């Protein structure tokens, strides 16, 4: 079997029917022409923010990571492993893609430990066992995996989806694409940077050009490139006509290498 490709979905993708239609059409196009197995990894930050607002609960972030108190983890699990995961599964069904909805803990695919007590139920992701996902891929299924994990003590954990995707790609020996709202990393003038190294990223973070959630995204991509020993792509799902080429290794956003 060819090396799988992990596609991490982020941004407002889950909120936009048009975006989901474009993405799944691109997935179908790719799967028709290529043998390479695909694995979808997702978070659902926008969905969680919306739910928090409806329930009048505060959203607190620390260094771009969501603080998850004990009284919110059940709600976040429901939003990510429930609504977000099954929404994506529904789109797969609609496009005749055989898919399976999972979380990080299924088959111990990604191991999760407590990241920082101050962040509450926020987990640190590390590579786990590839057995379950490889079995599904060999049988022709496309796994759709949420960023909810479980510690060995049985605690539910919210994991940053970029970091979860990195651990998943490491588990599977897979390439990784981080799909989001932006067409890659932008310079001070809003222009896309095609190639990015760790040195260049540190420079742009120090200059305040890369900020907030994008710092987490860039660091996740750099961590991924380091641990996987191969470049990682950050790209936008908005350019749907270019997605099959991206899935086939053509850089359309920012390619990050160490």
Swiss-Prot record:
Where can this protein be found? Answer: Cytoplasm
Enumerate the Pfam families for this protein. AA_kinase
The protein's annotated catalytic reaction(s) are: N-acetyl-L-glutamate + ATP = N-acetyl-L-glutamyl 5-phosphate + ADP
Where are the disulfide bridges?
Answer: none
Q: What does this protein do?
A: Catalyzes the ATP-dependent phosphorylation of N-acetyl-L-glutamate.
Q: What is this protein called?
A: Acetylglutamate kinase
Complex formation: Homodimer.
Pathway the protein takes part in: Amino-acid biosynthesis; L-arginine biosynthesis; N(2)-acetyl-L-ornithine from L-glutamate: step 2/4
Check the record and name the Gene3D superfamilies matching this protein. Answer: Acetylglutamate kinase-like (3.40.1160.10)
- GO biological process: one example: L-arginine biosynthetic process
Q: What is its EC number?
A: 2.7.2.8
Transferase keyword on record:
yes
- The species this protein was found in: Yersinia pestis
The entry assigns this protein to a family as follows:
Belongs to the acetylglutamate kinase family. ArgB subfamily.
- Give the source's domain of life in one word: Bacteria
Task: Return one GO MF term.
Answer: ATP binding
Keywords of this entry: Amino-acid biosynthesis, Arginine biosynthesis, ATP-binding, Cytoplasm, Kinase, Nucleotide-binding, Transferase
Which cellular component, as a GO term, is one annotated location?
A: cytoplasm
Which residue numbers mark the site Transition state stabilizer? 8, 217
**Main EC class of this protein?**
transferase
- What InterPro entries does its record include? AceGlu_kinase-like_sf, AcgluKinase_fam, ArgB, Asp/Glu/Uridylate_kinase, NAGK-NC
Q: Which residues bind substrate?
A: 44-45, 66, 158
Report the transmembrane regions from the record: none
Q: Which residues bind ATP?
A: 181-186, 209-211
């Amino acid at each position: 079997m060819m090396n799988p490709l992990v596609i991490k979905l982020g941004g407002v993708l889950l909120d936009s029917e048009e975006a989901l239609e474009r993405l799944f059409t691109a997935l179908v196009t790719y799967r028709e022409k290529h043998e390479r197995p695909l694995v979808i990894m997702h978070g659902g930050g926008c969905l969680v923010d919306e739910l928090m607002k409806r329930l009048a609960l505060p959203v607190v972030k620390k260094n771009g990571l969501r603080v998850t108190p004990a009284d919110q983890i059940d709600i976040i699990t429901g939003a990510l492993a429930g609504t977000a995961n099954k929404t994506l599964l529904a789109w797969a069904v609609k496009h005749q893609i055989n898919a399976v909805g999972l979380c990080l803990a299924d088959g111990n695919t990604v191991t999760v430990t407590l990241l920082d007590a101050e962040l509450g139920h926020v987990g640190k992701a590390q590579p786990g066992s590839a057995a379950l996902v490889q079995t599904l891929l060999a049988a022709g299924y496309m796994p759709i995996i949420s960023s909810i994990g479980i510690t060995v003590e049985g605690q539910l954990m919210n994991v940053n989806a970029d970091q979860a995707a990195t651990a998943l790609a490491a588990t599977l020996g897979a390439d990784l694409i981080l799909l989001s709202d932006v067409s890659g990393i932008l310079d001070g003038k809003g222009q896309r940077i095609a190639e990015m190294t760790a040195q260049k990223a540190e420079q742009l973070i120090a200059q305040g050009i890369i900020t907030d959630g994008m710092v987490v995204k860039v660091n996740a991509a750099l961590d991924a490139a380091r641990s996987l020993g191969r470049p990682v792509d950050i790209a936008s799902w908005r350019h749907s006509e270019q997605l099959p080429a991206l899935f086939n290794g053509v850089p359309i956003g920012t390619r990050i290498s160490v």
